[in-house]
Amino acid sequence: MLGSVFFFCTSEAMRNATLSNSVRRLALYCALLWLLAVTPGTSWGQGTPQKPLVGLTAGGEATLEADQQRQAGKIFYADGHVDVRYQNARLQADHVQYDNESQVVIAQGHVVLDYNTQHVEADDARYELRTGRGTFHHVRGTFAMQRHPMPTLLISPNPLYFEAEQADRLDENTYRIHKAWLTVCKPGRPTWKFYAPAATVRLKQSVRIENGNFRLYSIPVLYLPFATVPAEQRRDSGFMVPDLGNTSQKGYVLGDSVYWAPLDWMDMTLGASDYSKRGWSQKGDFRMRPWEGAVFNASYYGVIDRGLVVDGEPPVKQGGHEAKLLFTSMLPGGWRAVADLDQLTSLTFRLAWSETFKEAVNSEVRNSAFLTNNFDGFSLNFAALSYQNYLTAAPQTSITLRTAPEARISSVDQAFFSRLPIYFSFDAFTGGEHRGEDVTPFETPGFVGRSEFAPTVTIPLHFGQWLSVTPSFTFRSTYYGGQLRSGTFLDQGLFRDTEELSVDIRMPVFERVYEGGATKWKHVIEPYAVYRYVNGVNDFGRFLRFDEDDTLTDTNEIEYGVTQRLYRRTGSGDAEEFITWRLTQKYFFDPTFGGALVPGQPNVFQTLDALTPFAFADEARRFSPIVSDLTIEPGKRFDTQFIVNYDPQRNRLTAIGTLLKYKPYKESFITLAHFSTLNLPLNPSPPPPNFEQHSNQIRTLFGYGDQNRRGWNVTLGASYDFVQQAFQNQIVEVAYNGSCCGVGFEYRRFSFGTIRNENQYSVVFRIANLGSAGNLRRQEKIF
């Protein structure tokens, strides 16, 4: 360095000179230094840390560090480890020229620009400090992208990397790059990359590629005249990646969609697919968040079907559509509005075209729209409801229930006397009801009025610390605008006035604590009994069935049971409920429920459904089945529930249910659902179509990893009917994800008799942080 060399030469000369010579030479050197310092033409100096440039920019102070600096007029020159800083920008190079008037930096040799999450390297560059605009040649750069985890998006910590012959920085977040390739893979040997003669990178928005192509292992596989890929969270409008696939029932599948996001709070997707063997489908999704707390989602899926050909028979058309709408919003005054609508043309359409087994086997269609407001212990609701349950698909039979409109008001228990333990509550509603069914043709004309008022008085009593008795008294008055007579609707009003008594008895709770090491266990036994008495229903068969309120019957019963809980506490953490086991049964003093029970057929009453959802009453009986509900939750790796119904009158199990979630090792998982029921026989015989005396089905999924986990991921699943001895659904999914991309393959089979017997083959290529290409979309779940 010039300064260092100068100081070394001066010291050597002084060692061999006389004092007078030294003084003269020192004076001469000082004069020369003074002349250099005051000369306006040029100036030299050692690298001075954080030396401000002479002209300050409008946005603040720019500083420069270098091994050597000099000034020639308005131009500053710096060489060797040059470091220019301005606001959040840092420019490094071997040589820099800075024009103090135009505030332009011209850099050469090992140019590096760092700005927030941007890192750009180039051979040379021209950069404007004031505007942030610049041009770089022979560029390499990385831009960090933050993506939130999504079920269908592979996430990689790698930044977006690009190389280009030239990059124009248009502003702090926009780059126009030429003859470039981009990837999120490691730059040494990228698995994939986009090549484009021209591309525009808008940070936190998108990357737009013009006349480019997608390359896999440097081999072009897809030409892209114009493509947009997302960068971070912002959405961009445009055409989606085409869908390609093949199934045994649809044939070859070719489809595409267009995505439109005109506003930050609204977007829409419209698409269509051609099925070579069947016809074509249409789909659409609309999402909107118009204001805070409001959600609006709408979707449509339809198929125009040429028909399914089976064994040379004439084509059977299974086309139709399903449209869904969901709207939720908080309104002024504490009101909440909800509309959850579902319109389905037929059960056959759902069975034939649903993407997952869970959707296909759902035979219910529910619609609800309501306004609700909770205030001061009261709840006020206005609703319109619809429920349709398909019993068979071919021929199609169903039961339809509608309520429109309905107003309901209720209250929680409230004490009107400060010194007396007496609490009052009530429930009241009025509305119009409709019922229609195809099995035994029946339909109410229009809507039938139904109103109810039910005040309740509750008196909690405590006898020391060992016994609590809580009696409740309810008077329920219900009016129906019509009634049933011999299975025929009669347009004649009818009142149902009932007196109801409930006595809840809570006995002493037994508990014991076991201590061993760092883990403490607590065993709790909670016995209980509830007595119920209902009188006044009388002729149960006259009342129309619109919902569970209409299945109220006379009863005189006692329910008794015991709940055992095992708690576990490790160290100083909170106690967790490890095991819960509930045993319960009912004894009926009135085995005919006031004459409502019809022998020889399943009877569905409110008091029976409250115990178990599996019908068991086809004759007069005193004892109900014993219901056992065992739940084991030892931690995050294991969760299971066993439900068993044992009928002592028939001396056999009538229902067995198992739900299991288990993670035996690291990312491995097992999910299982099994239900076996013995349905009551129907009278008269023979039973109706599709009736099964015995039902025994199992569904299971097991595997390792998930769709977006790095490495190998495998999922296997099946649904098997033991009675029909047939698989209804099978799935095999294998995927491998690297640091920047992944590939997945899937096989699915649906078997629904003559309606659908289909093999599906799907493939997907996942591009980390950007999206995916292929027709493997949704992962199967059991619960």
Place the predicted regions along the sequence by residue.
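Hydrophobic alpha-helical signal peptides and transmembrane signal-/tail-anchor segments
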Residues: 3-9
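Outer-membrane beta-barrel proteins and related beta-barrel translocases across Gram-negative bacteria
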Residues: 118, 124-182, 187-197, 202-203, ...
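Charged (often Lys/Glu-rich) extended helix/loop segments that serve as interaction or gating elements
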Residues: 46-183
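Bacterial N-terminal signal peptides
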Residues: 27-40
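Sec/Tat signal peptide C-region and signal peptidase I cleavage site
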Residues: 41-45
